[in-house]
Amino acid sequence: MRKFLSKTHHHTNPLWRVYRLVKFSKVFKNVIIIEFSKFIPSMVLKRHIYKQLLNINIGNQSSIAYKVMLDIFYPELITIGSNSVIGYNVTILTHEALVDEFRYGPVTIGSNTLIGANATILPGITIGDNVKVAAGTVVSKDIPDNGFAYGNPMYIKMIRR
C-alpha cells in the first residue's frame, strides 16, 4: 500500500503553485546536484554526494548507475539499503502532482535489491530485501522481501530461496 501525504488545490494545478509547498532555493540546489551527479562514474563519490548534500540514506556498497534521476523536491525521503543496485536511467519519485492534488511520500529500497534499467518507482513505495525489479517496470505498489516485479502494470512473483 502506497503511503503518502497529500495537499489539495482547488483552483490551479499544484505544479503552478509548487514553490508555496517547496522552497525554490531547495529545488534549485537539488536540481544542480542531481543533474551533475547523474554523470559521475565513481560510485563512491556519487554515494558520498547524495548522502552529504541531499541527505539520502544509502547503505554500504550500494551502487547508483549512470543517469539515475532522483526526485528534485524531496530526495531526502529516499532510503536505499546495503549492497543494492539502482540501474541505468531509473527514476525514483517521492512526489507526484495531479490536476488537483500534490502527493509526497518516502521511497524505501531494501538491501541486496536490484532495480533494473529504466524502471520508475512512484512515491510512497517500499521495496523489500532481496528483490529484483525488471527493466522498464513501473513500481506502483509495495514489493515484499524476495519478490520479483516486472511489467506495466506491475506483476509480482515470489523468488524461492
Curated annotation (Swiss-Prot):
InterPro entries: Hexapep (IPR001451), Hexapep_transf_CS (IPR018357), Hexapeptide_acetyltransf (IPR051159), Trimer_LpxA-like_sf (IPR011004). PROSITE patterns: HEXAPEP_TRANSFERASES (PS00101). It comes from the Bacteria. Its EC number is 2.3.1.-. Pfam families: Hexapep_2 (PF14602). One of its GO terms (molecular function) is acyltransferase activity. Keywords: Acyltransferase, Repeat, Transferase. The keyword Coiled coil does not apply. Belongs to the transferase hexapeptide repeat family. This is Putative acetyltransferase SACOL0827. It comes from Staphylococcus aureus (strain COL). The lineage of its organism: Bacteria, Bacillati, Bacillota, Bacilli, Bacillales.
